[in-house]
């Protein structure tokens, strides 16, 4: 689980494009807090803080506390808008949560032991179908990543969600099929039949 952090914020008295431009000139960006059956709350947060949090990674899987005057609100960043040319943050949406909340998050997939994967050592290519997996998880226990060990996978193998050991209380949103996360495929110049024959010979000799 990523370490939680606190951001200072202030209530926005005005909304709209003119107000947003003024905020950005003063080193702030507009944001909104929604959810938990409460009306949306328009706020402003530090541009610098949000910029570094986004580019550090894990922004949408890490719980934050927004300090607004004497009030503290636990939130999960749900979405953000970037300038299409200069790639800096323009707006952030925060979901209001509690420690007991169950939230939907896209958790990144990390592949381990690529150097020792039999299929990759023989020239195979890791074809990643899903770089993230949409899951439900406790708000106070969102994993930083889902780790998949490649050390036992050969050319032609597929990695499905059923083969992945997820942390406690973390479940994929898709429940109606055993979806594929990645495959190890043969390079274009490899004869797959030779690889299959080699695997069969190895199994017979064991």
Swiss-Prot record:
GO biological process: translation
Protein name: Large ribosomal subunit protein bL25
Superkingdom of the organism of origin: Bacteria
Family: Belongs to the bacterial ribosomal protein bL25 family. CTC subfamily.
TM spans (from-to): none
Keyword rRNA-binding: yes
Molecular function GO terms recorded: 5S rRNA binding; structural constituent of ribosome
Keyword Transcription regulation appears in the UniProt entry: no
Subunit comment: Part of the 50S ribosomal subunit; part of the 5S rRNA/L5/L18/L25 subcomplex. Contacts the 5S rRNA. Binds to the 5S rRNA independently of L5 and L18.
InterPro entries xref list: Rbsml_bL25/Gln-tRNA_synth_N, Ribosomal_bL25/Gln-tRNA_synth, Ribosomal_bL25_b-dom, Ribosomal_bL25_C, Ribosomal_bL25_long, Ribosomal_L25_dom, Ribosomal_uL5_bac-type
GO cellular component labels: cytosolic large ribosomal subunit
A Pfam family this chain is assigned to: Ribosomal_TL5_C
Keywords noted in UniProt: Ribonucleoprotein, Ribosomal protein, RNA-binding, rRNA-binding
SS bond partners: none
HAMAP family on file: Ribosomal_bL25_CTC
Function of the molecule: This is one of the proteins that binds to the 5S RNA in the ribosome where it forms part of the central protuberance.
């Amino acid at each position: 689980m990523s370490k939680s952090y606190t951001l200072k914020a202030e209530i926005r008295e005005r909304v709209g494009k003119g107000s947003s431009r003024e905020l950005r000139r003063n080193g702030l960006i507009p944001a909104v807090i929604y959810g938990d059956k409460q009306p949306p709350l328009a706020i402003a947060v530090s541009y610098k803080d949000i910029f570094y949090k986004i580019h550090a990674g894990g922004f949408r899987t890490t719980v934050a506390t927004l300090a607004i005057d004497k009030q503290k609100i636990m939130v999960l960043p749900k979405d953000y808008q970037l300038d299409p040319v200069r790639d800096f943050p323009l707006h952030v949406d925060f979901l209001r949560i509690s420690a007991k909340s169950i939230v939907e998050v896209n958790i990144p997939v990390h592949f381990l032991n690529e150097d020792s994967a039999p299929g990759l050592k023989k020239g195979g290519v890791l074809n990643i179908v899903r770089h993230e997996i949409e899951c439900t998880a406790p708000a106070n226990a969102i994993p930083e990543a889902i780790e998949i060990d490649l050390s036992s996978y050969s050319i032609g193998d597929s990695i499905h969600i059923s083969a992945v050991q997820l942390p406690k209380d973390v479940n994929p949103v898709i429940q109606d099929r055993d979806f594929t996360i990645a495959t190890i495929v043969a390079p274009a110049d490899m004869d797959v039949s030779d690889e299959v024959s080699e695997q069969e010979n190895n199994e017979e000799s064991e």
